[in-house]
Structures are given as structure tokens and as C-alpha cells.
Amino acid sequence: MAGFRSLARQVRDTRCDLALRRYSLRKCLERFAPYGHRATWDHLCARHSIEPEDRAPDPARLVAALDELEQARAVWLAYEEGFADRRKREKHDGLRRPAAIDDWHRRTWGGNGVARCDSPGAHPSAPLDEVLRRLISALEDGPRAACPVCEETHIVWRQDLANEPWFGPVCAGCGIVVPQPVLTSEAVAAAKRAGRQELASVA
């Protein structure tokens, strides 16, 4: 199975036909897709003016989309390296029990779904690397009352997410499933109330 870097080389390889280069970019998303596969593809297509179903898109646009994905991946891999070093130090110091953020991190190792968007068409519009930097800052700074990506305070708890963790707080502004460790307990409680109110309004 080809890795991310091998697939990225195929995307850039002008000897390959455009259908294969597009396919290779889609396969890259099986290795790294911050919003989830479909939402990350929708994001890249929107930002780089690629028709999602076009089998022979402009090669310059394909490469620009890959560049954005690679920049975001570099940001995330650097964070993961620092995270792994921190856990090693903590274990060496006798701190074996992982924190809530560590449990969340285990589910997103590799960067897949790190800022998952439950609806493929609802995702942040900013460049992927910028979104990940905001998220990483929030993970390092501690809990807050607003979405770490767009600062929206209207966050709604959903019980019917399409992917793991299957339930959680969803930002009404940018569409990400907000990692619970970055929200205060009051913000999580408010999101659950908002979720119950939405359910009651459609009952």
C-alpha cells in the first residue's frame, strides 16, 4: 500500500495522466484528512476551484490542493512528535494515566478526523494549516467557551454523528466536531442543552 509521500509524488508526476493524478490525491486523503475524507476533499475542491467529479482537472490546481494538504500535514506531524515526546517524559516521571486530551488524541493519531466535520459540505473555509494551528493552540492553552477554529460560541451537542466518536459538540459556525478537551465544562453543558432544545423543537 502506497504511503502519503509516494502518492504525493504521483500527483506531481507530469508523466501520469490526470485521472491517475486526481486519484492519487484522493488516496492521499486516506492517509491524512483533517476534516474526514469527504469533507477534506470538498474543502480542497472549493479552495482550488476543482470540480469534485472532474476526472481530468487542471494539473496546477491539483498540485495547489496537494500543497495545502502537505502544509497541514507538516503542522500536524510536528505537533504529534511533540505530543509523543511529552508522553514519554510523563511516563518516565511516573505519570501513567492519560488525560482526556490523550484519549482524544489516540482516536485522531495520524491526523485523520482531527477536526472532523460531520457534514461534508460544512467545514472551515480557512487554509487547512491555519485551522490546525488554531486547534493546536487550543489544545495547548486549555479549555475555552468557544470553538477553537472560528470562535463561534453556538455549539450544539449531536447524538447522531456519522463517525467516531458518534456523539459530541458540533460548532454551528464552521461545522467541526469540537474536541471536548478544548471546551470548558460549562460550554459542554451549554452544548448539551442546545442539543436537547433542537430535539424538542422537531419532536
PLM features per residue range, with description:
Residues 1-33, 128-131:
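Short terminal alpha-helical segments
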Residues 12-20, 35-37, 52-56, 114-122:
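Charged, low-complexity interaction regions
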Residues 38-65:
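Short, charged early-sequence alpha-helical segments and their helix-coil boundaries
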Residues 140-144, 166-168:
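Residues immediately within or flanking Cys/His clusters that coordinate Zn2+
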Residues 147-150, 171-174:
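Short cysteine-rich clusters marking metal-coordination/redox-active sites
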Residues 154-155, 178:
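Cys/His-rich microdomains that often coordinate metals
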Residues 158-169:
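Short linker/helix segments within small regulatory modules
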Residues 175-192:
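Short metal-binding segments enriched for Cys and/or His
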